């Protein structure tokens, strides 16, 4: 199986002046060919993110890699929540973290197969735990 490894970390901060909030801008990158999350320095080259795409030090593209952004939120155990994280609440309801045009959301599946979307904020995440991610635990979303 695949194993989870380190995340990318950008030395940037997002500042939201309206809410007086500052958060780290971090990413993790999933490599579909190697079936794992890549580290910032994986192998003999460095990777970066430019315009939402993973690039090598000489600008080469890596289309097999998917970029997932840190949400700025943590689950009830203090684990950082990223796009693609799978969360579970105390009622064993499960959803996946997604970005939409309207912001950060949790996409949950009803018993009848329909989906519903819930806006995410730290208050909402305080009783949720991360039980996996979209790449290594797709079976949790069935």
Task: Describe every region a protein language model picked out.
Residues 1-142:
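Secondary-structure transition motif
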